[in-house]
Structures are given as C-alpha cells and as structure tokens.
Regions:
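Aliphatic-rich helical/repeat scaffold segments used for oligomerization and domain docking
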Residues: 1-446, 463-465, 470-488, 512-517, ...
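Intrinsic-disorder-linked linear interaction elements in eukaryotic regulatory proteins
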Residues: 306-309, 325-331, 355-725
Length: 725
C-alpha cells in the first residue's frame, strides 16, 4: 500500500495480528455456533462468553470452552468469503496490548507511520474505522474487562467487532452487543471432533460415544484425548479406561472428583514422555506454563538460556546454540495435544490453554518452577531486540514478561528489580504507550518501596523511569516531584559533578519547563552547566549540550537576549572543537537562528537559517527530515521579514519535499500545508489558501485524533478565509 494513502474499496486486503491456527480436527460446532455468523453483520458487535456449565462446581475452567477457536473459524470464514478486506486479531489481555495492536493495524491500513503517543494513534485508528467503507473485522481475544477498552471501542457501518472473554459481564456495559455463550460440546460436536481427528484408522473410534460421556463433552479434554489416541495404537475405549483409572487416582489424592481436563493433560504428558524420555518434556512444559499462553515467541527457545536449562553447555558470543533439544521437546508436546504451534508467521509461536498452564504450575515442584522462571526471564531478555524494529514483536514479549511477573514475582525480585522488569517498562516507553507506561512504572516504584531497602540502586532507576514516563505523558508537576527525588538520592550517593547528578539536573529542568516553571529550570541548568564545566571541562561535548539546554530554558523564561549570548558562545566552541559541519553544530546554529528571530533580529536569523540549510543539504542530504524542517523555518523567517514571494516559494518547496519524503498525511506535512495556506492568505491569494486548507482539514480529521490542536487551528484559518470571502 503506498505510503500515506488511505485504503479504498480497491485497496490490498490484509490481516494483522497473530491469529491462532484452527486445531487439527476442529469441529465447526454447528449446535453451539448456530446463528453467530449470521449475526456477525456489518455494524455488529458479538461477544463469546463461557456457557453456564463453566460456572458450576468448585473448579472453574473458563478458558477451556473453545471460544477462541470459534472466533478463528468466524474470522477465517469471513476472510475467505471476501466479506471483509481487513482482519485485525488482537490478544486483548491488557490495554497496552490493544493499543499496540491498533498501532500496527493503523500502519497496515494507511501506510502512515505513527507520530504521536500510542493512545493518539489508537484514536486515529478508531476514527478511521468509523469512517472507512472498507469492510473490516476486529477480534479482541480474551478481553479481561471492558475497562481495557475505554475510548477504544471500534465501531463503524462497514465493520464487525468480535470479542471473546471469560467475563460474561463484558457485553452488559455495551448496548447493541449480542452475547453468545460457548459451553460444552453437544454430542454431535464431540463426535465430530473425535472422528475428524481419528480419520486415519476407523478402528480407533470404537467406544467413542462412551469416551465422550466419560469426558463430559469438555472441549479441551476431548481435544487432548483425540491427540493422544491419534498418536498411538489406542482406541477410544482404551483411552476411556486409562482416563477412568487416572481420574480415580487424582480424585483420591485431592479429596474430590477432578474435571476431565485436569485429568487428560496428565495422560498427554505421559504420552509425550514415552515419545521423548528424559526431563526435557517436563522442563519445557513448566517453562511454557509461566509465559503467555496466547503466544510465546519461538525465538525464546532458540536462546542459550533455554539450552543450558535443558542441560546444554554455555557457548561464546556468536557461537550457534544447539536448538535440537528444545524443539524436539516442543514438537513432541505438540503431538500430545498440550500445545499448538502457529507456523503461519515468519517465526513460530507456541500456544497453550490457560487451563493447562495453571494445572502444570500447580503440579510442578517449587524448585522446578523457580528454575524455570529464572530461565524464562533470561531467555526473554536474550530474545528481546535492542532497537525493537517490529512493534508487534515487542508487544508479544511484553505480554510474556507480564505473565511471568504474575506467577513468579518472588523470583523476579530475589536480587533487586530484575532486568526483565526494567526492559519491559522501557519497551512501553519506546512504543510511546504513555498511559500504560506511567501505570507500569508507578506500580514498579511501589514494589521497589515495598521490596527493596531504602536507597537501593534499582529503586533509583525505576524512579527516574517513572519521572520520564510522567514527562512523556505531559504530567509536568508529577515529573518534577520524581526528578527531585532522583536528584536528591543521586546527590547523597555520588560525588559532586558526577555525570549522573548533572543528567538528573537536566531532566529536572525539562520537567520544570513543562510544568510552567521556566525560571526554576534556568536555575537548575545554570548549576548543571557550572558543574559540567568544572568537572568535565568547558569544551566537553556534554557540557556544550547542557549549555544548549540552558539556552532553551532562557527562551522559555522570556530572557531571549541571554539565550542568544549563550548560543553564540556555544556555537563558537562547537565550530572550534567539533567542526562547522558537525550535526550538533548545525543544531546549535538552528537554535540560535530561532532565538534571533524571536528577538526581532530578522536579518541575522535569515542568515543563520541559510547557513544551516546549506550545511544540512551538504551533510545530511536534501531529503533528510532535518533539512526539510530547516527549509520550513527559513520560509517563516522570510515571511516575518516581509519577503512574501520568497516565503511562498520556499514554503511550496517544503510542502512538496515533505509530502514526497514523509507522506501526505504525516503530521509535519499537514502543519506545513497549513503554514503555506496562511502565506497564501497573507499574500491575498484567498482561493489558493481555501483550496489548501479544505484539503488539509479533511486530512487532519481523517488521521489526527479528535480535538487535535492542529485540526482546530486549520479550522479557524478556514473560517477566517470564509469570513473575508
């Protein structure tokens, strides 16, 4: 799909998300699913929830009714029939997972790279869904609560929303949501499940009806039984006998009759261990049981951590890890019906029912669980890409880290705050998930206070991250409070002039500016500059960077002349030490040009902007975003000086460059088009101004969140032109 384009009826069809495969021998469940497909029409919302059978008794197996498999069937049916052109599948176990899924879908649908926070991108996507004529289906699988969808409910006349949840109250808070309970198999559905799976040898079907009744028609239990029978010489009646004996053994030990699914998984484990003797099957199962059963990246099992866990030896960096033991175990476990492996994507994904995961965790000895948890944490860190080039992969890794944290908290805090917890939080920051990031770091800070001694280094790291998250979310006052705490702690533990203390002062100043306390920011940065000059030297690159920050604070405090003096000094130092064509030198020169313009020194500002533009074109290239931004700034300076023809001509060039490089719907392109329209208006070209503004308004409303300041500004400009016309 072309960059910046909005999909049309002729757009390329696409699917987003890691949709699970249909299970082998899947039954389309004609009795349970009757009417769901007919109800899933454009504009509809359907919720699949557990049937009443799953609320009965002491044991509650809400995750074992087959809701996800029915959702997969419905999605595949709509896709293959051509009823929808877009399928978005999201494992909606948290708000951050939904936000990440929407962001990926937004890029796939529009070709526009996200530029704002994840919340703003999600709002854009929801707005786009409401307006597009392209038929779509969004599946939110395993939604724990409607609170996760506050402001994120997808809707639109061309779309369908399908939700699966263990909470039957999910639909109650949303009008016009049709609820379909998914309970045990009917006899017909159960028989279909068995006979489809046992199609190779009809003799294995002997005793099928008796087995179905023995298993109580529980979907998960039947699927596991069918897998074991299909991979053995057993018939249904043989499995029924094994099942009855094992159920009695477990019931005597537990003091109550266990559910069918709590028995069948142990028989599946027995078969897997017969097929692959040794400890690897159990070790891998416990490892999987601690992670996110909705999707565990196969790359985790390619790590040295897992290799050592299974008995391998450590290898040097760059030396291939022996993958055979882990994948031998995974394939055997899959044959036994305890997991499924989704091979549809580039990298395999391992899936396991939450019911089976819970049973394995209960059965595993504490020492084995703890070792598996330590391995899982290390393997996740090993598999986590440093630069996170693929947002969906990062979202899946965060989900697995969250699952591990929920079941192995003590292990992750045994020696301070585990690096995995910090990595997961930084991943939220990278993904610009501002709201979830604040919540995550805030909870981690509370855990630090409860679990770590006062002054622990990890607590200070978390405090700094929480402050940064508050700042990114626009909560200046909260960011100031936490940065002050960080600075106080740093000052107690470190010597004066330590780089960490200086960095803390700079961060505090950033927060003070956002909080509207520019004068306090100037005070903090003057001290930071003095310390940096004393302990690093006046010409150190970091000292020069802090001086640039001080100049920015001086401008914010309305002391532009002081900012100009400082920037002039810093620029001279940069030219002497780093060279005139260093990127940092160009940045300082551009900052000086802006200050000169703000101070009314227009000719000097234009001269500086011209120099920056020439340098950036020579060093970075004409199409670099910084070069285009400089050209836009120079056009603004021309306008301020009254050189209207030059301003218009350069602004037109800037818009053309921005559309070509960034895309027509990029927020910077939209802002530059609005600026061009204002120049047209100032030049008396009302018709041209109106044409550009109307197009820009339409684009802003389509791709920016509701109430975005740029959209409001463009509307006001258009209204002014209409009034003058």
């Amino acid at each position: 799909m072309p960059s910046g384009g909005i999909p049309t009826e002729q757009s390329v069809r696409f699917r987003v998300g890691d949709m699970p495969p249909l299970a082998e021998g899947f039954s389309d469940r004609p009795d349970t699913a009757r009417g769901i497909l007919d109800a899933l029409i454009p504009g509809s919302t359907i919720a699949l929830v557990p049937g009443s059978e799953f609320a009965e008794g002491k044991q509650n197996w809400l995750g074992a009714s087959g809701k996800t498999q029915i959702a997969v069937m419905l999605a595949e049916t709509l896709w293959r029939s051509g009823a929808v052109d877009m399928v978005v599948w999201i494992s909606a176990t948290s708000r951050s997972a939904v936000l990440s899924g929407y962001a990926e879908a937004w890029v796939a649908a529009t070709g526009i790279e996200p530029t704002g926070t994840a919340e703003s991108v999600a709002a854009q996507f929801v707005s786009w869904l409401a307006e597009t004529s392209q038929p779509w289906l969004v599946v939110l699988d395993d939604l724990p609560s409607v609170d996760e969808l506050d402001g994120l409910w997808p809707h639109g006349p061309s779309g369908r929303l399908l939700i699966t949840s263990t909470q039957s109250t999910v639909a109650a808070s949303r009008r016009r949501t049709r609820v379909f309970p998914v309970g045990f198999f009917s006899v017909r559905e159960a028989l279909s499940c068995l006979t489809e799976r046992l199609s190779v040898d009809p003799a294995q079907r002997q005793g099928a009806i008796d087995l179905i009744e023995a298993l109580g028609r529980e979907p998960l239990a039947l699927a596991q039984a069918a897998a074991v029978i299909a991979n053995s010489a057993l018939a249904c009646r043989d499995y029924r006998d094994y099942f009855a004996r094992r159920r009695q053994q477990i019931g005597v030990a537990a003091g109550e009759v266990p559910s069918a699914a709590s028995v069948t998984w142990t028989l599946s484990l027995g078969q897997a261990e017969q097929l692959l003797p040794g400890q690897s099957v159990r070790l891998i199962l416990v490892l999987i049981a601690l992670l996110d059963g909705h999707g565990i990246p196969g790359t985790i099992f390619n790590t040295q951590s897992v290799s050592i866990y299974l008995g391998g030896t450590a290898v040097g960096f760059g030396t291939p890890v022996d993958l055979q033991p882990a994948w031998d175990a995974l394939l055997i476990i899959e044959r036994a019906g305890l997991i499924s492996i989704n091979r549809a994507e580039g990298s395999p994904t391992i899936l396991m029912s939450p019911v089976v995961q819970a049973a394995i965790r209960v059965a595993a000895p504490a020492q084995v669980r703890d070792r598996a948890a330590r391995t899982a944490a290390n393997a996740l860190l090993e598999a986590w890409p440093i630069d996170e080039p693929h947002p969906w992969t990062a979202a899946v890794l965060r989900a697995n880290a969250a699952s591990l944290q929920s079941v192995a908290t003590d292990i992750l805090w045994a020696d301070g705050c585990d690096p995995l917890l910090l990595r997961a939080g930084r991943s939220l920051d990278i993904a610009r998930l501002a709201g979830p990031a604040v919540e995550y770091w805030r909870e981690l800070a509370v855990s630090c206070d409860n679990k770590l001694p006062s002054g622990h280094p990890d607590a200070l790291v978390v405090a700094a991250q929480l402050a940064g998250a508050y700042l990114a979310a626009g909560y200046g006052a909260e960011a100031v409070a936490w940065y002050q705490r960080v600075l106080a702690e740093r000052s107690l533990d470190l010597a004066p002039g330590h780089p960490a203390i200086i960095a803390a002062r700079v961060s505090l100043a950033d927060a003070l500016i956002v909080a509207g306390k520019a004068a306090d920011a100037v005070t903090a940065l003057r001290r930071a500059v003095a310390e940096s000059e004393q302990f690093r030297g006046p010409g150190h690159p970091d000292t020069l960077a802090v001086r640039d920050e001080l100049a920015r604070a001086l401008e914010a405090a309305a002391d532009v002349p002081a900012a100009i003096r400082l920037l002039t000094q810093t620029l001279a130092e940069r030219e002497r030490l780093q060279g005139a064509h260093d990127v940092h030198t160009m940045t300082t020169r551009g900052q000086l040009a802006a200050a000169l313009l703000a101070d009314g020194k227009i000719k000097q500002a234009i001269s500086s902007y011209k120099r920056v533009l020439a340098d950036r074109e020579a060093v970075l290239g004409r199409d670099h975003p910084d070069t285009i931004a400089t050209k836009a700034s120079l056009a603004g300076a021309y306008y301020t000086s009254g050189k209207m023809p030059s301003a218009v001509q350069l602004s037109e060039q800037t818009c053309a460059d921005s559309e070509r490089v960034l895309g027509a719907d990029h927020v910077d392109t939209l802002a530059r088009r609005a600026a061009l329209a204002n120049l047209y208006y100032a030049a008396g070209r009302l018709g041209d101004a109106g044409t550009v503004l109307r197009d820009t308004v339409a684009r802003c409303e389509r791709v920016l969140p509701s109430g975005d300041p740029l959209t409001q500004t463009v509307h006001q400009s258009l209204a002014s032109i209409a009034g003058d016309g």
